[in-house]
């Protein structure tokens, strides 16, 4: 039994950034460096590429403190994607909860075997720690890659189908799905909770991870179908001597009834604040557009002030819980990038092969008179100003800011707001601007973002 606090907390290499100083940066291991010209080809899109000194130097220049990695646990794409020769690029289709995703390792490590892949991940985490960064993992314990009844039998379905997956009360053969992914792990069963906690402890203690972001966390806290902050799984996280001292961030919703639970998880959990996201977008985008047309906007100054001051209506309801529990963001992997919020009024997900039915239609986005890229100087100026306003609001508000990788230089996904299948140039960051001899718009925005982060650090 290795359940002690000393292994992780006693290692001086862990930065242990206070919540009040934390600036989170969400990135995809492959997409961040797949096009990185500073890396040799064999390191691009890999754990080793992310750990390269030049990569870390860029992140240091930006000023963020905590790197949140999209899922890096071993994954398997859903059958319907495989049949279309597509992959689940984001990785929210976990196959192995104790194993890193091998495809993000260098070819040399993959050929050497699982041990070499694991070591490459450990080396990446250590390099980030030495550079001053915390490493937070996005983890998916709400469902598995086995999907619904039509999905494959790979592991849990074959081991103990009735125990691992939640069932409807009226028909035990029917899966109860609150994730939108075909199945839901049943955290009312003790062995499921134990399995998840052991997995988290492995990543924290053996790999060196500093925190976790829990996908669709409302699902993890349902008893008899209803959300409760007193769920045994949440209690297990709070009370564990190792995990209870790490950063734990909840995505406080799921697809089930009464699934939106922002602000309700309590201490010690932080939560993604969708109210901040929607308020900031509305205030600087759709309301500005309405005002120009002589209409009244949706967002009052009082509502905006509440978000600027830490969303006390959501996160000051428990004694000792403050604004840092609010993870503020304007954009994340799931949705438009910040730049695309100013270029596209409508989603453009045709490349996903689902006839543009996938992805949210509720984006609070505008296009300033032209859908997509535009060379008109007035429209360009309006878009740049809106981006700066949103990033300024994000980085200077009370709470814990989270920046989407690429937003600091105006990255676009060409209007795709659900790029989960796009393992290509759509999601791979374009770094050409770094090597331009001119004062590009990307460089200007990067410099502004880094100054805002520096100002935040000096203030808080």
Which residues are covered by each model-predicted region?
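Conserved alpha/beta catalytic core and glycan-binding cleft of carbohydrate-active enzymes
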Residues: 229-405, 409-410, 418-422, 460
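The feature marks proteins involved in alpha-glucan
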Residues: 1-28, 33-45
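Hydrophobic faces of well-ordered beta-strands that scaffold small-molecule active sites
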Residues: 23-25, 67-69, 135-137, 212, ...
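Catalytic cores of secreted or luminal carbohydrate-active enzymes
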Residues: 434-460
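Active-site rim elements
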Residues: 9-14, 186-189, 220-224, 317, ...
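Short, flexible loop/turn elements at secondary-structure junctions
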Residues: 28-33, 54, 73, 96, ...
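Substrate-binding/active-site clefts of carbohydrate-active enzymes
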Residues: 30-208, 216-242, 247
């Amino acid at each position: 039994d290795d359940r002690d606090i000393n292994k992780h907390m006693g290692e001086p290499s862990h930065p242990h950034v206070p919540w009040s100083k934390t600036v989170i940066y969400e990135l995809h291991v492959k997409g961040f460096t797949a096009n990185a010209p500073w890396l040799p080809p064999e390191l691009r899109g890999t754990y080793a590429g992310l750990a390269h000194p030049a990569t870390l130097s860029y992140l240091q220049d930006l000023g963020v403190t905590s790197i949140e990695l999209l899922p890096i646990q071993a994954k398997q794409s859903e059958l319907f994607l495989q049949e279309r020769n597509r992959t689940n690029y984001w990785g929210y289709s976990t196959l192995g909860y104790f194993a890193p995703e091998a495809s993000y390792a260098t070819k040399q490590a993959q050929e050497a075997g699982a041990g070499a892949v694991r070591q490459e991940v450990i080396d990446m985490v250590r390099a980030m720690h030495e550079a001053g960064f915390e490493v937070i993992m996005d983890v998916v314990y709400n469902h598995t890659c086995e999907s619904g009844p039509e999905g494959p039998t790979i592991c849990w379905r074959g081991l103990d189908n009735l125990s691992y997956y939640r069932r409807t009360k009226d028909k035990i053969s029917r899966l109860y799905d609150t994730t939108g992914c075909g199945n839901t792990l049943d955290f009312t069963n003790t062995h499921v909770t134990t399995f998840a906690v052991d997995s988290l402890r492995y990543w924290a203690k053996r790999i060196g991870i500093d925190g976790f972001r829990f996908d669709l966390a409302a699902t993890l806290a349902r008893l008899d179908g209803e959300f409760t902050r007193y769920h045994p799984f949440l209690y297990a996280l709070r009370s564990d001597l190792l995990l209870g001292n790490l950063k734990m961030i909840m995505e406080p919703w799921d697809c089930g009834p009464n699934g939106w639970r922002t602000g309700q998880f309590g201490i010690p959990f932080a939560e993604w604040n969708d109210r901040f996201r929607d308020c900031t977008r509305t205030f600087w985008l759709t309301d500005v557009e309405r005002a120009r047309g002589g209409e009244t906007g949706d967002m009052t100054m009082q509502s905006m002030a509440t978000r600027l001051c830490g969303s006390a209506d959501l996160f000051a309801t428990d004694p000792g819980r403050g604004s840092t529990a609010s993870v503020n963001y304007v954009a994340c992997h799931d949705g438009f990038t910040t730049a695309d919020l100013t270029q596209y009024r409508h989603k453009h997900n045709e490349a996903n092969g689902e006839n543009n039915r996938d992805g949210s239609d509720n984006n609070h986005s505008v296009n300033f008179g032209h859908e997509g890229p535009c060379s008109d100087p007035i429209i360009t100026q309006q878009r740049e100003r809106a981006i700066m306003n949103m990033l300024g609001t994000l980085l200077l508000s009370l709470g814990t800011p989270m920046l989407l990788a690429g937003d600091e230089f105006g990255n676009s996904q060409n209007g795709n707001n659900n790029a989960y299948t796009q393992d290509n140039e759509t999601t791979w960051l374009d770094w050409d601007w770094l090597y331009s001899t001119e004062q590009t718009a990307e460089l200007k925005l990067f410099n502004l973002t880094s100054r805002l982060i520096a100002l935040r650090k000096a203030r808080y």
